[in-house]
């Protein structure tokens, strides 16, 4: 793939995964399918993670409490992404928690209203990520600790490619099915890119042990969640893609904080 093509795919991936505006000229010849675009998801994660990382750096530089700074940074990240992945996590939690069968779970996941399981999942997601990010900030210099945000953003979006490629669509008429399924090459490129980005950001800043811990935690989380969804729904949906990102981000941040 040419560098220009990859840059265009990254910009399109940013537009799909966030509310960051991109030039309309990038979409004139684009068919809207995401099968190839997933290879750029990790690089899109870097772009998406830049704004919350900058906010965290500013707050830590002003000697703000690390937990408060982490919560504000995560809130800004939600604004940047339009809560795309958080919505998927909440819908998946409601569907899996409230559905007694595959069909009932999928029906619940279509409901835009949030239920008890979804609310609990969102609260826990924010709480655990904020606590982990605050722990990283307490044990690292401000300029070092903020690198965790784009690193984990890239890693968790690479995990989306794995989940998406390894499972068939749960619904033939679903959004995920209409967007196309990544091929093996796109998935492998996304995983390799995510690993490279994480290595370049985490190893120099935090060391080898935190790097290995975050990679292992995210990988195990992606494998376990994909196997769980295969058993429960026999396929992926747009919501389970978002849930994969959230779960892997939580796992990577917790592992990174623990390994420091």
Swiss-Prot record:
GO terms for biological process: cobalamin biosynthetic process. The chain crosses the membrane at residues 40-60, 64-84, 117-137, 141-161, 188-208, 209-229. GO terms for molecular function: adenosylcobinamide-GDP ribazoletransferase activity; cobalamin 5'-phosphate synthase activity. It catalyses: alpha-ribazole + adenosylcob(III)inamide-GDP = adenosylcob(III)alamin + GMP + H(+); alpha-ribazole 5'-phosphate + adenosylcob(III)inamide-GDP = adenosylcob(III)alamin 5'-phosphate + GMP + H(+). Its cofactor is Mg(2+). Pathway: Cofactor biosynthesis; adenosylcobalamin biosynthesis; adenosylcobalamin from cob(II)yrinate a,c-diamide: step 7/7. Keywords: Cell inner membrane, Cell membrane, Cobalamin biosynthesis, Magnesium, Membrane, Transferase, Transmembrane, Transmembrane helix. It is an enzyme of class 2 (transferase). It is found in: Cell inner membrane. It is a multi-pass membrane protein. The keyword Cell inner membrane applies. Pfam families: CobS (PF02654). GO terms for cellular component: plasma membrane. It comes from the Bacteria. Its EC number is 2.7.8.26. Joins adenosylcobinamide-GDP and alpha-ribazole to generate adenosylcobalamin (Ado-cobalamin). Also synthesizes adenosylcobalamin 5'-phosphate from adenosylcobinamide-GDP and alpha-ribazole 5'-phosphate. Belongs to the CobS family. This is Adenosylcobinamide-GDP ribazoletransferase. It comes from Rhizobium leguminosarum bv. trifolii (strain WSM2304). The lineage of its organism: Bacteria, Pseudomonadati, Pseudomonadota, Alphaproteobacteria, Hyphomicrobiales.
């Amino acid at each position: 793939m040419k560098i220009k093509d990859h840059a265009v795919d990254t910009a399109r991936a940013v537009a799909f995964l966030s509310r960051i505006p991109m030039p309309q000229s990038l979409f004139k010849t684009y068919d809207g399918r995401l099968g190839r675009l997933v290879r750029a998801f990790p690089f899109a994660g870097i772009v998406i993670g830049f704004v919350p990382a900058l906010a965290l750096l500013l707050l830590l530089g002003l000697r703000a409490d690390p937990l408060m700074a982490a919560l504000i940074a995560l809130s800004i990240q939600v604004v940047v992404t339009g809560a795309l992945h958080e919505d998927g996590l909440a819908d998946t939690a409601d569907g899996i928690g409230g559905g007694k069968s595959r069909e009932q779970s999928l029906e619940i996941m279509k409901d835009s209203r949030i239920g008890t399981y979804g609310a609990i999942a969102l609260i826990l997601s924010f709480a655990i990520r904020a606590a982990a990010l605050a722990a990283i900030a307490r044990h690292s210099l401000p300029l070092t600790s903020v690198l965790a945000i784009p690193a984990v953003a890239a890693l968790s979006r690479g995990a989306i490619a794995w989940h998406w490629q390894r499972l068939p669509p749960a619904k033939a008429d679903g959004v995920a099915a209409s967007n196309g399924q990544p091929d093996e090459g796109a998935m492998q490129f996304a995983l390799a890119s995510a690993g490279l980005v994480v290595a370049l950001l985490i190893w120099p800043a935090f060391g080898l042990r935190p790097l290995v811990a975050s990679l292992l935690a995210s990988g195990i989380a992606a494998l376990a969640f994909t196997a769980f969804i295969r058993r429960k729904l026999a396929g992926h949906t747009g919501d389970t893609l978002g849930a994969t990102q959230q779960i892997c981000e939580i796992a990577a941040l917790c592992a990174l904080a623990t390994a420091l």
